[in-house]
Regions:
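Rossmann-like NAD(P) dinucleotide-binding subdomain of oxidoreductase/dehydrogenase enzymes
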Residues: 55-182
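Glycine-rich loop-to-alpha-helix module at the N-terminal edge of alpha/beta enzyme cores
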Residues: 1-54, 64
Length: 182
């Protein structure tokens, strides 16, 4: 229900969110209104559907392939994203975290925090306190703080190879998984 409510909030505020996203990163309003904002809402709806799957079910997909569905929340996920798709990237990262029953600390790009901060404001009454946390600031300070913090059970990063290497090393030192889009 929460993910569908988030999608509805995005739909209800699509013009406003598209304007904020365009002001935030300079992308043409025609793109944010026609692509970024609707795709974000669709992404929350998609994951709302995913969590309807039967927990613990098993399917034989082929001679040597068995598919198992288990729900095992991993814990707090630290996520760091780049400047170019701030709102859509937030949807891509947040929807699966919520669907899996986890919490996140979401670090925006220091140059494009506005649309994610506005999104967080709009959904604050739908998402329980402490589940979706947004931090801003320079990557060398707030991003590094996340990499050094012992409370994360997974790290996710989208951006440069150089920083991605640092994220991978931080995850390896903690023996936690990392998702890297470089």
């Amino acid at each position: 229900a929460v993910l569908n409510k988030i999608a509805a909030i995005i739909d209800e505020n699509k013009e406003h969110l598209a304007m904020v996203e365009s002001m935030d990163n300079g992308k043409p309003i025609r793109e944010t209104l026609a692509v970024d904002i609707p795709m974000a809402a669709d992404h929350f709806r998609y994951f709302a559907g995913c969590i309807q799957a039967e927990e613990g079910s098993a399917n034989i997909l082929g001679k040597d392939t068995l598919s198992l569905i288990l729900r095992e929340p991993i814990g707090v996920v630290g996520q760091i994203v780049p400047w170019n798709f701030p709102f859509l990237m937030a949807a891509w990262k947040l929807a699966p975290v919520l669907a899996s029953g986890c919490c996140t600390v979401f670090k925006t790009s220091s140059t494009t925090p506005l649309s994610v901060l506005e999104f967080a404001r709009l959904v604050q009454d739908v998402i329980p306190a402490g589940v979706f946390n947004v931090i801003t600031g320079s990557g060398s300070k707030s991003g590094q703080y996340m990499l050094d913090h012992p409370g994360f059970r997974k790290l996710a990063f989208t951006g440069s190879t150089e920083v991605g290497r640092n994220v991978a090393l931080a995850a390896a030192q903690k023996l936690i998984p990392a998702t890297l889009e470089l």
